[in-house]
Amino acid sequence: MDSELVSYLAEQTAEPRLVIDEDEVQVYRPVGQGAKRRINSEESDVSEDGNSKPKRVRRSSVEIIFREIKKNNEKKLKDDFKASDYEELEDDDDDESIEEESDSEFEGESSSDEEESSYDSDSDYDSETEPEDSDDDFEAPVVKIPEDRQVLSAKRRCTRSLGVIVKTVEEVTHENRLKVNSMSVCDLPIDNMADLKVEHIKFYKRNTTFTEEELAEIEEDLLAEVKARYNNMKGDFRRSKTIETTEDDKKAGEVNKYDIDDDFIEKTESDEEEEITEDDSSEQETVVVEPVDE
């Protein structure tokens, strides 16, 4: 057998050889005619004759990896230590804040200048909130609560039906615009819808700011419509519990709940009581038939 063929076959079946240099580590595998190909490499440079060159790997890479692991572990320990200290400080702050909140609740002080007080329709409020003067000379507005739960729901229905919302306006100096905080009609600090002003009503867009010119474009008829619908709904809530149309009323013509006076309501209630007493007396009367002797 030819010696060249033997050497060629030996190169094809040879194991990868690890060549260690002073500055770099290279892995080679003989591939035909002495060409070199790098094994397990992420990137490779291609030479002019088309053969791939091995990527140089620094000897200090292993040391760098271990150094990074050690650094990360030390950083994690420091972060955990700082986090534990922070939690202890945060607990102390929470205790102080709880004491401050309890004091402010008894004194009636407001906790924030920007937040508006909101009330649920399911709860009744009969007392007026009168905040005391704080150290910062902040005067919170006195909120007068509506007297009835039905009035609250009537106001909310009125708001949804008209697509309007009440706004509280404060000046924003850096933008030279009016910052508008939205609140519902039931949270208005007024006793009656008659005290409602034109500036409080506008077709709303959420998360927007309005200028003075935009607020000036609100018309009087919108306010009148709000008041009218509010009064009608309030009457609806008051009368719907006492007036019920019967089948005879439906045949003769449905009774309009909004045009019935309170005197008529009292008369109908008294008539019903008289009818009930008459029925009871008729039931108590019994006829006794004595047998006749022959």
Curated annotation (Swiss-Prot):
Organism field? Ostreid herpesvirus 1 (isolate France) (OsHV-1)
Q: Which residues form a coiled coil?
A: 201-234
**Acidic residues: bias regions:** 86-139, 260-283
Instruction: Indicate yes or no for the key word Coiled coil.
Output: yes
**Keywords in alphabetical order:** Coiled coil
* Listed name of the protein: Uncharacterized protein ORF90
- Location of region: Disordered: 25-59, 77-141, 242-294
In this chain, composition skew of type Basic and acidic residues spans: 242-259
Q: Where is the signal peptide?
A: none
